[in-house]
Amino acid sequence: GXFGKAFXSVSNFAKKHKTA
C-alpha cells in the first residue's frame, strides 16, 4: 500500500543524509 511507499521514501532519505 501507500505506507510501504512512504517507508521506502523515508529509508532512502535517511540513506542520502546518512541519518540513523
From Swiss-Prot:
This is Styelin-A. Hemocytes and pharyngeal tissues. Transmembrane segments: none annotated. GO terms for biological process: defense response to bacterium. The lineage of its organism: Eukaryota, Metazoa, Chordata, Tunicata, Ascidiacea. GO terms for cellular component: extracellular region. Bactericidal against several Gram-positive and Gram-negative bacteria. It is found in: Secreted. Its main location: secreted. The keyword Secreted applies. The keyword Secreted applies. Keywords: Antibiotic, Antimicrobial, Secreted.
